[in-house]
């Protein structure tokens, strides 16, 4: 049976085990790991695949033998797979999910302006996908030239 789970620091709010129990026949556990224990967990952890959440989406990268092109571009990993040789492969599924939603929305965004509200972790993924699909991307954040006080000019 595959051993899967969610890696993060504080996971008490997660519904992931219940969701995955409905999806398939594999073990899915929450792995709450302190930052100072991350290296030992990744190199010796008893898992086959993990979803990765804050604060480890960037921190796991040095432990990956290989990254998918999108994970490399974004500098963010939210899926880890332990290969048969024991090495870790890092990927970012958020980009695929967001691209799927955009493509299936029925709206062609190529050549159109897209406003991204916020510049946190998910923002980089959204920006990359929108740009890849041909949109002109503007990021609105709390500070900087394009911010919430002048949103109306967009």
For every predicted segment, state its role.
Residues 6-7, 31, 136-142, 154:
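Short, hydrophobic beta-strand segments that form beta-sheet elements in well-ordered domains
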Residues 8, 90-95, 102, 106-107, ...:
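Glycine-rich adenosine-cofactor-binding loop
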Residues 45, 143-146:
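Short, charged helix-to-loop "capping" segments that act as catalytic/coupling loops
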Residues 48, 135-136:
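Short acidic/polar active-site loop segments enriched in Thr and Asp
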Residues 146-154:
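Rossmann-like adenosine-cofactor binding region
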């Amino acid at each position: 049976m595959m051993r899967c789970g969610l890696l993060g620091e504080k996971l008490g709010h997660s519904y992931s085990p219940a969701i995955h129990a409905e999806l398939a026949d594999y073990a899915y556990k929450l792995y709450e790991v302190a930052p100072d224990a991350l290296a030992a967990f990744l190199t010796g952890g008893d898992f086959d695949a993990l979803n990765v959440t804050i604060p480890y989406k960037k921190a796991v990268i040095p432990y990956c033998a290989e990254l998918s092109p999108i994970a490399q571009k974004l500098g963010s990993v939210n899926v880890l797979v332990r290969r048969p040789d024991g090495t870790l492969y890092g990927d970012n599924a958020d980009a695929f999910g967001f691209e799927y939603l955009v493509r299936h929305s029925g709206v062609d965004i190529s050549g159109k302006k897209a406003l991204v509200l916020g510049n946190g972790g998910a923002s980089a993924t959204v920006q990359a996908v929108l740009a890849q699909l041909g949109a002109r991307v503007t990021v609105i954040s709390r500070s900087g030239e394009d911010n919430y006080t002048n949103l109306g000019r967009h």
